[in-house]
Regions:
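Non-heme di-metal
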Residues: 1-174
Length: 174
C-alpha cells in the first residue's frame, strides 16, 4: 500500500496531473504574457521535479527491498491507476481550454499528457500506455529546464504594466 501511494502521489499526481495547468501558464509566459507568474511556475516546476525524482527513488527502493510485491497484477494496477490519472487530467485540460487558444493546440497538449505519463511509467520500470509517443511540445521541456542553482531572490525584477496602460485592450489581446 505504501509503494502504491508513493507511486500515485509522485508519478501520477505531481508527475503527470500538475502538467496541465503548468503547460497552460507556461504557454502564456512563452508569449511574454504574465512574466512574473510564469517565472514563479518555472520555480514551482523545479521543485516539483525534485519531488517527482525523490518519490520515484523511494518507490524503486521499496520495490527493490520488497520484491514480492512487484507482481504482474501490481504492475497492471499501477498502470491502470496512471490511466485514470491521465483521463482526469485530460478532462481538466478540456474544461480549461475548450478551444485552441493561448498558442496551445488542445490535441498536442492532450498528447503531451500521454507522453509525460509514459515517461513516468518507464522511469518506474513499467510498460508505457502509449508506446512510441513523441513529445509534441518540445518548447515545454525547454521552459521547464531551469537552472537548479538559480535563486528566486537573486532573479531580475520583471516589469509590469499598470492596468491603465491596458485600457482599450480586448480580452483577445491579453
Amino acid at each position: 500500500l505504501l509503494a502504491k501511494n508513493i507511486f500515485v502521489f509522485g508519478q501520477c499526481m505531481e508527475g503527470t496531473q500538475f502538467y496541465g495547468l503548468f503547460g497552460m501558464v507556461l504557454s502564456l509566459y512563452r508569449q511574454n504574457k504574465f512574466p512574473g507568474i510564469g517565472q514563479m511556475f518555472r520555480y514551482t516546476l523545479r521543485d516539483e521535479s525534485n519531488h517527482i525524482e525523490l518519490f520515484r527513488n523511494l518507490f524503486m527502493d521499496l520495490i527493490e527491498e520488497n520484491r514480492e510485491i512487484w507482481t504482474a497484477d501490481f504492475k497492471e494496477e499501477l498502470r491502470q491507476t496512471m490511466a485514470e490519472g491521465i483521463r482526469l487530467e485530460k478532462d481538466f485540460i478540456r474544461d480549461c481550454l475548450p478551444v485552441n487558444a493561448v498558442g496551445l493546440s488542445i490535441e498536442e497538449f492532450l498528447t503531451y499528457i500521454d507522453y509525460i505519463a509514459d515517461r513516468r511509467l518507464e522511469g518506474c520500470g513499467l510498460t508505457p500506455l502509449s508506446p512510441g509517443i513523441k513529445n509534441p511540445l518540445p518548447w515545454l521541456a525547454e521552459m521547464m529546464d531551469i537552472k537548479k542553482e538559480q535563486n528566486f531572490f537573486e532573479g531580475r525584477v520583471t516589469e509590469y504594466q499598470k492596468s491603465s496602460a491596458l485600457h482599450g485592450s480586448s480580452d483577445d489581446e491579453l
